[in-house]
Amino acid sequence: MIHTDRLTRLFLALASIDNPSRQEAAVSTYIKNQLDELGIRWREDGTGELIHGNAGNLYGYLPGALDLPPILLSAHMDSVDPAVGKHPTLHPDGTITSDGTTVLGADDLSGVAAILEAVRSVEESGAAHRPIELLFDVAEEPYCAGIQHFDFPSLQSKEAYILDLTGPVGSAAYQAPSILA
């Protein structure tokens, strides 16, 4: 079961971290700490160096007890500018906004938070699940600069959910310039 209060706190924490493109190290460290808490093996690639950034793409793997192919969950760690000095504000009605001086960073830290909470909830439930691959990429905003350097053949998943889309809940994109084929 998803814990909405915990998800809100997680998003607020992530949205408080500076995360302009190619400067995602602090967000990456936060995610790595979350993955460590969950006992999820992770690795960071060398993309940061290739794109003159301070962090690489993060890959995580959570084994599953079900004999099913893994599924990939993905979101990017950067936000459009201005993404430095962010102050997310939780309003009494439950909405979250920026303070108006920067972006909120919901694109795509909301996706990062949703993935981390979903994985935590699955683990806490004790329910058998299929293996889960996680991919958190850097420098998505400047034309997917970071994900272009990821080692896609290393992925086992044939199905993926990339949590980076605006629109009504339940909307899905089936084609885009950077959709994994």
Task: Map each language-model feature to its residues.
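Active-site metal-coordination/substrate-binding segment of hydrolases
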Residues: S28, Q34, G53-N54, Y61-P63, ...
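N-terminal capping segment at the start of a domain
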Residues: M1-R22
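Short glycine- and acidic-rich boundary segments immediately preceding or forming the N-terminal edge
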Residues: D18, R22-A25, N33-L38
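Short glycine-rich loop/turn motifs
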Residues: A55-L58, A181
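Residue-level detector of anion-binding/catalytic polar loops
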Residues: R41
